[in-house]
Amino acid sequence: MTKDDCIFCKLANGVFPTNVIYEDEDFTAILDAAPAAKGHALILPKQHSDNLYELPDETAAKVLPVAKKIANAMKKTFNCDGVNVQQNNEAAAGQSVFHFHVHGIPRFKKDGISLLWKPGKPTDAEQAETCKLLKDALQ
């Protein structure tokens, strides 16, 4: 299913022209229009899901191999020092277009791009409590 008002549905399905770097039956990968770095790409499923929570398992199983292909192409093309493969869910996590997508961002030492966080220092008891809560939710 696609959504009529979703820009990423339209880009993934060729309704609007864009810079396509990869396409198969399920996905289109395009250059980000507002890149964090040269070569920053978005992997877009052709079928609409707002986020990871709604993504069909069969689509989820196929997206990481595509991300791997894109990351390898970035490494080969740009000889970058690393590649971020990132996926955001909901506005609080940085999602700005509500169509599931994965970012691939070529990275270089000292490129000034900050996607890192300050590591926390939870106690063993806090970790045990958090672990139990998540395990219970997975039951």
PLM region descriptions:
Residues M1-Q139:
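HIT superfamily nucleotide-processing domains
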